[in-house]
Each structure stands twice: as structure tokens, then as C-alpha cells.
Amino acid sequence: MAGSRLPRQLFLQGVAAVFMFAFASLYTQIPGLYGPEGILPARRTLRPQGKGRWQQLWETPTLLWEAPRLGLDTAQGLELLSLLGALVALGALLLSPLRHPVIYLLLWAAYLSACQVGQVFLYFQWDSLLLETGFLAVLVAPLRPASHRKEAPQGRQAGALPHEDLPFWLVRWLLFRLMFASGVVKLTSRCPAWWGLTALTYHYETQCLPTPAAWFAHHLPVWLHKLSVVATFLIEIAVPPLFFAPIRRLRLAAFYSQVLLQVLIIITGNYNFFNLMTLVLTTALLDDQHLAAEPGHGSRKKTATSWPKALLATLSLLLELAVYGLLAYGTVHYFGLEVDWQQRTIHSRTTFTFHQFSQWLKTLTLPTVWLGVASLVWELLSALWRWTQVRGWLRKLSAVVQLSLVGTATVALFLISLVPYSYVEPGTHGRLWTGAHRLFGAVEHLQLANSYGLFRRMTGLGGRPEVVLEGSYDGHHWTEIEFMYKPGNLSRPPPVVVPHQPRLDWQMWFAALGPHTHSPWFTSLVLRLLQGKEPVIRLVQSQVARYPFHKQPPTYVRAQRYKYWFSQPGEQGQWWRRQWVEEFFPSVSLGDPTLETLLRQFGLQEKSPPRTRSANSTLAQALHWTRSQLSPLEAPALLWGLLMAVGAVRFVQALLAPCSLRSSPLAPVSGEKRRPASQKDSGAASEQATAAPNPCSSSSRTTRRKK
């Protein structure tokens, strides 16, 4: 059976990369979002209630409780955490010795600390997904690099331990929960666009931050949009159970279908690090053999296959074809696919009702839980069998201790995850074991397991709602305040900002969906613009000179609600067209009774001036200097610069690595040393006979050390 050493390494590197992007993106926005002059100052969220130190840390788990001990306020502590998090994640991405459980525990704790004070700007599903994935990385990461281990059991990768595949199975289970729930909620929401298969005729122009490619995708034929929705349901609902298929090719087919979906989303929408995180999760569907990493895999000679193996291969192929046929039949049947040869189109429609789907979901949800149980039991039994192959009583004892600890943690996390997963079907939620509910309730605040369900309802069916802020000096002549990323200027093309998430622009999209009273932070934003606070202005325009009121703050600020649509192909120089709908926020000025009432109603009034006692501490000055050096860079440029730096370092590492390591798609980097083998491999006896094997020969990768 193919191992999972390289997929695990790929997963750990991917998690490190996403943490790096997430911390760096957040760092650029902290002063405007959480600083003393920000929209929602972080210092308001951490108020000691007279509780013990450990009690308040458990109830509100954030390292920022310790910021005053370092001479920092809460926002400065958040800056320090973000900087250190980005640097540590960068190190883990480049150096294999840093892919250690302690490192990933620190990254997880730092991001959890940020989420505790992040308020509405850190309430996104991908923030929860990163926390859950980051904690799984703590279990997946090896305690010791493979190069420092003794010989592995026969038939296993060098350095493999019996328990190593167990936590990696949880990654596959998380991917299943994410995708299956995201598909199911589109139908349980009763959204007419999803049920009518017309969701993508609206999605590209109504999503939060479209890319330029979204304009072109929006103008594709309607029948292709509807067929794409059918494909989405297929990939998100029907394919995920194949993640646990015993047939390897089915798992690989499921892998490529998920990759296709995520890549298309990345091309047409700016969803920060979410799609990258999902791609990282898909590594749990891979194996060493698929990554061309099995020792000697390419040099093995074909041998005659015994009839039992041939029969098993034939049965596997027949079962595989049966699964593909069943998926094809179900798609054609339940979505009424018909080919119109004259018009060269494919017609599609939903042929089942909401009641039928609800009954199907009620019937299927609990069996998917048992599918997970069966798959986990198989992994546990496989780990036990691998343990029996360990030689030496001391190694056996060490292996059984590790297997017991990791196995218990894996089962516990699986039980915890069943509670949020069962939210997709209330009946299943009520039938879960009460012990799972108690476990989940005990650790819910740590976000070890979360419920998911993206794009539940399609918004903007009658046009994309958009809030446009305006400022004025006299209350009669108004100037629009244009944001860097969200739609505003009709002639400006949509930007490409992935993997950065401009969190204010995202919340502006949510604010436009309802009245301003549903978004209390918006009143604080208006206040900061009236006050001319530069940290907030930099969230709107990083180059302050481009802000229309950079010389003097506006006397009045108001907001209008528009409906936006993509322009038609024939309109030259225009990406958008719009229509005024209504006033979103009334015209106010500093001291205006309306503004003061709203601030008091939402608890946003400044009760005391911000403390400045930490301004002179050495650490605070270092943070201030770092900010001054990085502030001229726009956030996407900073993140792309980090990505290019990683690519450059990897390129240099590849050049300096031995030839035998270059051929591997995940060649080990600094910190992993290879030792010459002294024991012959059965498939390369002649090459091993030499005293000093050529480091560039294929046999050098298949050698083993003596016990």
C-alpha cells in the first residue's frame, strides 16, 4: 500500500504557507481595524473581570492577556503576534526541522489569540477552517525528522511510524465535512437560484470581490452556467464520499475534481486564502506513489502477476467503472440533462423536490457518519498491524505509547467534529451520542471543530447591492470615497488581491445586504473618517494622497446604496453600470445628535482617551519602526513579495541539493541530511555493491541503513 509521507509533508508546508499569508494580511490592517484610532479598538475586548489568570485564559484563550507585561497595548500585542506568526510560518515553509508539532501549536495559538479580539472582522468561515486545520497540523507534524529515525518496519517508508497516518485521516474527514456541507446547504436553504440552477448567472458579478476573469465568465451562455451548477453539486455532494473509497483511482479522481473546482474559483474570485486552504486539505487524498516518491518505484521491473491479484485488479476496475456510471446516471436523471444538437446546448433542470431532497438527506447523513467510523476503524486496525511489524521491545513500547496517545486524540477529535457536522440535518444532530455533545461543548471555544456551509444563498438577484461613502465640506457638494478593492468606480477593472483579504471591503459587502443598523461597526467607520484618522484612511486607500480628503477631513459624511451590474460587452471603457437605490446612512458631522445616538446605542463611544503608557517601551518602538518600513507597501504586493521570496529560496535550495533529491517533487531542504546506505536493496543489488554510490543514481534513493 502506498505511503503518505510526502502528502503529509506537502500538507504541513501548505498549512505553513496559509498561516504566513493570513498573519501577513492581518498585520497590514491592524492599526485601522483594531488600533486605538481604529474602527473596533481591540483593547475594548479584553477587560479583566477579577478572575484568576488561568480562568480568564481558558474562557478567553488569547496570548494577548500577556501584552501589558511586555509594555504593549492589545493592538500592539496583536501586531507582535502577527509578525512572529508570519515569520515562524515562513520558517516552517522553508526549513523541514521547523515543521514540528510545537511550531504548529504556536501558530494555532497565535491565530486563535487574534480571533478572540478580531470581532466581526475575523468571523469568517475560513478563519475557523484555518484554526481547525492548524490544530490538525499539530498532530500530523512528526516529533522527529525521518532522517533521525531508526529503520522502519519492512514494507514501509524509511522512518515511518505506525501512528503517523491516523491524524492525517482527520484531514480527509475535514475535507469531506467542508465540501459535503457546502453542497448540501445550497439546497437546504431553498435558495431559488440554486434550485433553478441559475446561481452562476448572478454569482460572478455579485460575489464580494470579483476578478477581471469574472466579467468574462459572467457573459458565458446561460446553459453553460446551469451546467456548471450541476457540476458543482456533483463535486460537492456526490464526490466527497469517494474520499474514503478503498480503490485508489477513485480517490485520485475525487482529488482532481476538487482541485478543478478550487482553481476555477481562484480564477474568478478573490477569496483570500480559503481556496488555497482547501487545496492543502486535498493532499490527504494523495499518496507517495502518485507523487512519484516511492523508493525505487520507477526502476522496478514488471513481474508476472498472480491470478488472485489479477482478479482483484479486474474487480477493482469493474467497481470503479460502476461508480463512474452511477454518478453519470444520477447526474443525468436528477438534473434532466438533455443534449440539443440543433442549438448545440445542454439543457438541465432540477427534477427532484425539496421534500425529496430532505428525505434523502435524512436517510444519508447518518450513514455518512458510519462511513467515517468504518474508515477510521480501518485506519486504527492498519496502525495496529504496522505496530506488530516493529522490531525490538523498546521500539515496540515507544511505538505503542505514541499510537495510544495519537489514536485517542484522533478518536476524540472525530467525535467532537460529529456535532458541527450534524448541523446539516437536525434529526441526525439529535441522535448523536451524548458524549460527543459533551466533548464538543467543553472545547467549542477553542474552535477545534466547526460547521461549514459556503454560498448558502445567492444574494443580489436583482443587482449587486453596494454601499458608496461620500464626503463633503459644505453639505451640498459631495465627493465619493473610493475603496481600493471593492467595486465603486465604474471604469476601474476588478482587482486581483488573492491571497490577501481586505477585511473592511469584505464587511462593506455584507453591510450592503441590510440596513446600517445591522452593521454597528459602520457607524464607527463614519466617525473615524470624520475625525480624519490615518490608520482607517489607509484601509480605504493605502496611498493616503489618493484619498480625496487627505488634506482636511470632510465635515459631513453620508452613504448611498446602489445596485451594480457588470457592463455589457459593447460598452467601451466600462466594467460596471449602476443605479441609485436609496440613502444607506444619513448625512452626519462630528457632534451630530444622530451620530452620537448611534454610537451610544452600539456602545462605541470613547469612555476614556486611549492609554499611551506603552509608547516609549523598546518593543513598542521596534514595532513602530517595523510598521513605518512596511506601510508604503500595499498588502497584496507584500504577500506576493513573500511568495516570490519563498520561490527564490526554493529555487536556490533545488540547485544546491544533490541530484537524487532534485528528482523528488518534495525534496528535503536544509536540516535533513542523507546518510550513505550500507545494506543492499533487493531491487538494486549491483548498484549497492559499490563502496561509494553515485549520489545522482536512482539507486541512492532506495537504500536503507543498518539496524
UniProtKB/Swiss-Prot annotation:
Gene Ontology annotations for the cellular component aspect, listed alphabetically: endoplasmic reticulum membrane; membrane
One GO BP: protein maturation
Region (Disordered), start-end ranges: 665-707
Intracellular or extracellular location(s): Endoplasmic reticulum membrane
Keywords tagged on the record: Endoplasmic reticulum, Glycoprotein, Membrane, Transmembrane, Transmembrane helix
Compositionally biased residues, Polar residues: 679-691
Pfam families for this protein: LMF1 (PF06762), LMF1_C (PF25179)
Transmembrane segments: 10-30, 78-98, 102-122, 123-143, 165-185, 227-247, 259-279, 310-330, 364-384, 399-419, 637-657
Effect annotated for changing P68L: In a breast cancer sample; somatic mutation
Membrane-related topology note: Multi-pass membrane protein
Glycosylation sites: N489, N616
Similarity-based family: Belongs to the lipase maturation factor family.
Function: Involved in the maturation of specific proteins in the endoplasmic reticulum. May be required for maturation and transport of active lipoprotein lipase (LPL) through the secretory pathway.
Name of the protein in question: Lipase maturation factor 2
Gene (UniProt): LMF2
